[in-house]
């Protein structure tokens, strides 16, 4: 277990009942996040709640019974505290989804201890989760997609120093951007690709989704051409030991990292769309948007993007869905005019 997990978990009243209770249905990283959230909450109580501050000197001293005596106001004050707090002189702010996650964690903790009858009152039942404001998805427009691939191909907007490297990487860069923009795969799935995962006969790649699930994703002939051009170069490169079979290689002949792909995308995006903050994930959003506009099938988009819940997809593409509904209003005629 990590030091953070241990210290925060022990802070939850020197027992790990809660973590033991949720272990069968949660990932270890989820439990670590829960532990951190609980630690932040207990620190808030100790530092900001006058009655607790005057009674206890450290978070591990706070008894479980304290949870029974909290009010909805205490939790609302915690939400305010989360938005902007001072931690040992370090200013920390939380975005809406981070605040919501911490409140969700508390709901789980209170619910668990109430269910096992360790507390007689569950104040969190009366606390509403903060509402998230949906942000407009940042993505490339259709002409910007073409411009980005063109820029990777010709490098016209690059500095002289960048152009020297570009000669060696342009075929790889075009292949990588074409794959991200033409399939919507995650950057982690992209860098995890091996030569053996690419099937040119069927225009498919075998990728490993979150949770270890293997899926075949299919690509267009346009993407195939870009991948084939890179593959012709790739087979002539001897990769470094420990990186055998990696499809996308760095200049050091090692498997590309997520960070290097992020930098690559940023480099070309700055040239073609300086006002948009484009990341590899935004290329995924671009693909999802274009696929949805072309097909109108939200279930297909969810499946191809690997969303386990179609509601996640609906939430992301709600604005386009609204446009489609608006366009439907004139589709059915009641009387010929």
Predicted regions and their residues:
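Short, exposed "boundary/linker" segments that immediately precede the start
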Residues: 1-2
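Conserved catalytic core of the tyrosine transesterase superfamily
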Residues: 7-337
């Amino acid at each position: 277990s990590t030091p953070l997990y241990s210290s925060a978990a022990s802070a939850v009243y020197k027992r790990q009942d809660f973590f033991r209770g949720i272990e069968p249905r949660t990932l270890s990283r989820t439990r670590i996040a829960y532990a951190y959230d609980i630690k932040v909450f207990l620190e808030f109580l100790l530092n900001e709640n006058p009655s607790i501050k005057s009674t206890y000197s450290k978070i591990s001293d706070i008894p479980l019974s304290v949870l029974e005596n909290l009010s909805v106001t205490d939790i609302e004050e915690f939400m305010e505290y989360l938005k902007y707090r001072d931690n040992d002189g370090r200013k920390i702010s939380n975005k809406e989804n981070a605040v919501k996650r911490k409140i969700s964690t508390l709901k789980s903790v209170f619910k668990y201890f109430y269910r096992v009858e360790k507390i007689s009152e569950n104040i969190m039942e009366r606390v509403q989760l903060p509402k998230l404001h949906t942000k407009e998805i940042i993505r490339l427009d259709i002409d910007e997609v073409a411009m980005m691939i063109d820029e990777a191909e010709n490098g016209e907007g690059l500095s002289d120093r960048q152009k020297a490297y570009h000669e060696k990487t342009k075929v790889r860069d075009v292949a990588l951007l074409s794959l991200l923009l033409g399939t919507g795969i995650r950057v982690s799935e992209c860098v995890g690709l091996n030569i053996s995962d690419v099937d040119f006969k069927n225009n498919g790649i075998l990728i490993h989704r979150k949770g270890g699930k293997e899926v075949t994703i299919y690509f267009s002939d346009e993407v195939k051409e870009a991948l084939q051009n890179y593959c012709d170069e790739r087979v002539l490169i001897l990769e470094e030991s420990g990186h055998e079979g990696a499809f996308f290689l760095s200049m050091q002949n090692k498997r590309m990292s997520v960070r290097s792909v992020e930098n690559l995308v940023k480099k070309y995006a700055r040239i073609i769309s300086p006002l948009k903050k484009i990341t590899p994930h935004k290329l995924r959003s671009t693909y999802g948007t274009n696929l949805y506009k072309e097909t109108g099938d939200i279930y297909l988009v969810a499946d191809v993007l690997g969303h386990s819940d179609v509601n996640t997809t609906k939430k992301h593409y709600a604005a386009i869905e609204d446009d489609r509904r608006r366009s439907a209003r004139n589709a059915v005629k009641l009387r010929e005019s």
